[in-house]
Amino acid sequence: MRVVLRLPERKEVEVKGNRPLREVLEELGLNPETVVAVRGEELLTLEDEVREEDTLEVLSAISGG
């Protein structure tokens, strides 16, 4: 799957295999408590199954100010 990270810089990575979002975030070294993931217009939960053909966008859930 293609994963677009915006944390805050933009970076694209490829991840292989179908699995729960939680496992994808762990593989990428991301803390699931500090990011949100979107597939199209759908906000994903950590238990949602993501598939190899998906494109995900991962955004920081914490902002400074």
From Swiss-Prot:
GO-annotated biological processes: tRNA processing
Residues bearing the modification Glycyl adenylate: G65
One Pfam family named in its UniProt record: ThiS
What are the 1-thioglycine sites (modified residues) in this protein? Answer: G65
Cite the entry's keywords alphabetically: Isopeptide bond, Nucleotide-binding, Phosphoprotein, Thioester bond, tRNA processing, Ubl conjugation pathway
How would you describe the post-translational modification of this protein? The C-terminal glycine residue of TtuB is first activated by TtuC as an acyl-adenylate (TtuB-COAMP), and then converted to the thiocarboxylate form (TtuB-COSH) by the cysteine desulfurases IscS or SufS.
InterPro entries, alphabetized: Beta-grasp_dom_sf, Mopterin_synth/thiamin_S_b, ThiS/MoaD-like
GO MF term (any one): nucleotide binding
| Disulfide-bond pairs as recorded | none
Query: Per its UniProt entry, which superkingdom is the organism in?
Result: Bacteria
Q: Glycyl cysteine thioester (Gly-Cys) (interchain with C-192 in TtuC): where is this cross-link?
A: G65
Cited function: Required for the 2-thiolation of 5-methyluridine residue at position 54 in the T loop of tRNAs, leading to 5-methyl-2-thiouridine (m(5)s(2)U or s(2)T). This modification allows thermal stabilization of tRNAs in thermophilic microorganisms, and is essential for cell growth at high temperatures. Thiocarboxylated TtuB functions as the sulfur donor in the sulfurtransferase reaction catalyzed by TtuA. TtuB also functions as a protein modifier covalently attached to lysine residues of the target proteins TtuA and TtuC.
Which protein family is it in? Belongs to the TtuB family.
How it assembles, according to the record, is: Is able to form a heterocomplex with TtuA.
Protein name listed in UniProt: Sulfur carrier protein TtuB
Organism of provenance:
Thermus thermophilus (strain ATCC BAA-163 / DSM 7039 / HB27)
